[in-house]
């Protein structure tokens, strides 16, 4: 068995473990700091919405264009007066996105691009997206996200309890905020692929959280009938028992996404992969973090505020104090007995061998001598 497998077995049986719940304030602080940074980035820089959401034009040139991406981007911005995004496709053609343009402007931009690129205007394909259609798509995307969140909370409240539903909801908001904030900070374009990535990472984060919650539900069944563990301690054991599984699942999911983001988008220059791969990469990492460090410790906080759990904690601590007192008294009695049994250092050595007794004067009187008379 591998070392990781051995560690997983020891974590599952409670032989080793890290106290996530005890140190929850540290993880809460880290999450709050990251979330504030994401919100500030979102407020200052804002999201770079794609033309699918704000409207605009997309121009596609013929294959095997010799013009560079940077030069084409400069020509497109000069022709339109707006920011342009240029991507070189696999067949050598150029894809030029310009937001905030209408039909009349797109015709003029198309003429200017044909002159700069030395290509006939008829060979440049132009697709227009109206701003009203983009707003409609954006509104439907947000509505779909909101409906998803509501359904998740209802399901968790029915399958588990409302405290777990609330903790899972907080974890999902945590993951969305961090992912959207990272998008704002790096300046990547928000496209329908980004929305797909967000929905995907929400499902993954929810799955990872439900795995821990299911283990917690099983281990806390009839918890008030015992006086060995508190709810927080059982919650911590649930995290540790599923820790290796969560790590393995996260690593396996992150590897192909990292390949899309860093190799496909970064090294090979396939920029269209960035919109979905970045949301998946950040969201998967944030989801794994929130399911371990946020959701379950938050459930422990909410549960231990209940009167039953408070009474259980008092009984557990009282029993431990009583056991510790008995252990100390037994240990002190054993030490005292051992001290009394020890001889002092200056004691004379014990006499070993036959004991010399004084001779009796009347020894042999009245007894037959054994001689014949």
UniProtKB/Swiss-Prot annotation:
Residues 362-373 have a biased composition (Basic residues). Residues 333-346 have a biased composition (Acidic residues). GO terms for biological process: intracellular protein transmembrane transport; protein targeting; protein transport; protein transport by the Sec complex. It is a multi-pass membrane protein. SUPFAM superfamilies: Multidrug efflux transporter AcrB transmembrane domain. Keywords: Cell membrane, Membrane, Protein transport, Translocation, Transmembrane, Transmembrane helix, Transport. Its main location: membrane. Residues 322-332 have a biased composition (Low complexity). Residues 322-373 are annotated as: Disordered. Forms a complex with SecD. Part of the essential Sec protein translocation apparatus which comprises SecA, SecYEG and auxiliary proteins SecDF. Other proteins may also be involved. Belongs to the SecD/SecF family. SecF subfamily. This is Protein translocase subunit SecF.
